[in-house]
Structure formats: structure tokens, C-alpha cells
Swiss-Prot record:
It comes from Edwardsiella ictaluri (strain 93-146). One of its GO terms (cellular component) is cytoplasm. Its EC number is 3.5.1.5. One of its GO terms (molecular function) is urease activity. This is Urease subunit gamma. The keyword Hydrolase applies. It is found in: Cytoplasm.
Length: 100
């Protein structure tokens, strides 16, 4: 199978998000890459599901709380930018203050 660099990157993000969600379910506090991957995948899947940009931003902002992440992670992630594919094309989505 031949994958483009972008496809490889997406695959890595999805794989990390899968591991991170399993850790979250077990009550393990998430680190920076795990938190970013969950927020990113939530935004990408929301766009794929046909949601609006505003709906995607709100959903991605509500997927994690301070209790889900290690100390200091919230301050490391002031925003997350994701290029998501919506039904009408690709858009850059910025999720401000993604961990509440």
C-alpha cells in the first residue's frame, strides 16, 4: 500500500487517539500528544459527519477536561489547528482553549 505523507500523518494521529481514548477510559491522565490527538480526531470526524465548523469547534472543545490530562498540559495547548474535510471542502479549524 502506497500512502502519501499526509495519509501517514493522519494514520499516526488516529492510532495515537485510539490509544489515548483507551487510556482515558482506564482513568490514566493524558500527556500532550495524546490530548492533541483526541482533539484533532474529534474535529476531523465531526467534519466528516457533516457538522458545521462551529459545531466541530464546540465538540472538540468539550471532549477533554482538566481532570483528563496531566498537570501542565492545559497550559501547553492554547489552541489546536486542524485541516478538516467538510462536505463542501477542506477548511482550517482552530479550536481555542480546547481543554476546559
Amino acid at each position: 500500500m502506497q500512502l502519501t505523507p499526509r495519509e501517514v500523518e493522519k494514520l499516526m494521529v488516529y492510532t495515537l487517539a485510539d490509544v489515548a481514548l483507551k487510556r482515558k477510559q482506564r482513568g490514566v491522565k493524558l500527556n500532550y500528544p495524546e490530548a492533541v490527538s483526541i482533539i484533532t480526531v474529534t474535529a476531523m470526524e465531526g467534519a466528516r459527519d457533516g457538522k458545521t465548523v462551529e459545531e466541530v469547534m464546540n465538540e472538540a472543545r468539550s471532549v477533554l477536561t482538566r481532570d483528563d490530562v496531566m498537570d501542565g498540559v492545559v497550559e501547553l495547548i492554547p489552541n489546536v489547528q486542524v485541516e478538516a474535510i467538510f462536505t463542501d471542502g477542506s477548511r482550517l479549524v482552530t479550536v481555542h482553549d480546547p481543554i476546559q
